[in-house]
Regions:
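Glycine-rich phosphate-binding loops of nucleotide-dependent enzymes
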Residues: 1-352
């Protein structure tokens, strides 16, 4: 009865569309009862749907505010980025048929409890320096592919061949040694140790590389971390500060830097721009582009259509664990990806 102001911070980040509708209905009931709501979100379409008034912050500072009825999404984007570029479509003049494979996945299957497959006889390859996108709806099996590649599911079947040699995967540490690095979907739970500072988080996966006999070479560790902070432009006042002192975008850069410091041949990125603002997304895309140009092979999972269209050289689409489409270059269009993402559902419906 005493509630006057309700603050909601990214309340829809893990909700389905139907659940979002329920939340918005409750919010409208609360505002009708006289309760004020501060709604923090990077999902601009939600701001336009549920908001009455919007305030834009950039780098912790006030930029602008307006009534929602007087503005549109491009106005918000302009205020958030300060007129910075929207990320252009990736367009490289590369004859991929002449580029060697770094990774080949053949007939990959991951059994599902109760029968069927989470990943169903999947085949794909990855070229040196290529950005391969994996698109699909929730439950498509995308993250499970990464989990198989990183050794989390030793029960998987099929062949995983890296630079011509078949891998017999047993553990995550083995896969890191083999040249894989994973940027997980949930950076807070899986990508960061919240009790450690920025430097220790950045160095964590590459500690083997800083061994000096039975000890760690702290000087070498610090030099490598400093260089990575500079290379991917992590905005940090002091690397000894707690990791949670950073913005979401800079925390994500630390997770990416941690992976890069293991000197991988293949970088797996699961929803790398989730929960960060538009400006930080552009910076993450720049990082992807930079390392791909240097020859790093990258696989990106994304639920954001515009994002995957922009950054990928090639996209495979999964639905219910089945590969339902593969698109190259200018074939990568939002409508074709969406259509392919529904094919597996239709297959399952016909079989059941």
């Amino acid at each position: 009865d005493d509630l006057k102001v309700l603050i909601m911070d990214e309340p829809t980040s893990s909700l389905s569309q139907q659940e979002v509708k329920v939340l918005f209905k409750i919010m409208r009931e609360l505002t009708a009862a006289g309760i004020s709501i501060v709604y923090i979100s990077h999902r601009l379409e939600e701001i336009m749907e549920i908001g009455d008034h919007v305030t834009i912050l950039r780098d912790g500072k006030y930029v602008a505010d307006a009534d929602v009825k007087d503005i549109d999404v491009p106005w918000i984007v302009h205020q958030m980025t300060g007129g910075a570029k929207s990320y252009p479509k990736r367009d490289r003049e590369v004859d991929w048929s002449k580029v060697e494979n770094v990774l080949e996945v053949k007939d990959l299957c991951l059994p599902k409890a109760g029968g069927g497959y989470l990943v169903d006889h999947l085949n794909f390859e990855l070229k040196k320096g290529e950005v391969l996108g994996i698109y699909g709806l929730m439950g498509a099996g995308r993250s499970e592919v990464f989990e198989c590649l990183m050794g989390l599911h030793p029960e998987h079947t099929g062949q995983i061949i890296m630079e011509g040699t078949e891998l017999h995967i047993k553990s995550i540490s083995q896969q890191i040694d083999s040249g894989f690095a994973l940027i997980p979907e949930d950076r807070q739970m899986q990508g960061l140790v919240q009790t450690l500072d920025i430097e220790k988080n950045c160095a964590l996966s590459a500690l083997k590389r800083y061994k000096k006999g039975p000890f760690l070479d702290s000087k070498k560790e610090a030099e490598k971390v400093d260089q990575e902070i500079k290379d991917i432009q992590i905005k940090v006042a002091d690397k000894k500060l707690p990791i949670l002192s950073l913005s979401g975008g800079n925390q994500q850069k630390v997770v990416i830097g941690k992976g890069i410091l293991t000197e991988p041949k293949i970088l797996l990125m699961d929803e790398p721009s989730r929960g960060i603002d538009i400006g930080a997304k552009t910076e993450v895309f720049d990082i992807i582009n930079k390392y791909a140009e240097e020859g790093l092979s990258i696989i990106v999972i994304s639920s954001e259509l515009q994002e995957i269209v922009s950054i990928a050289d090639r996209v495979i689409v999964l639905s219910n664990g089945i590969k339902t489409g593969e698109f190259f270059g200018n074939e990568i269009q939002q409508d074709t990806l969406v259509l392919a993402s529904y094919k597996g559902h239709h297959i399952e419906e016909k079989e059941s």
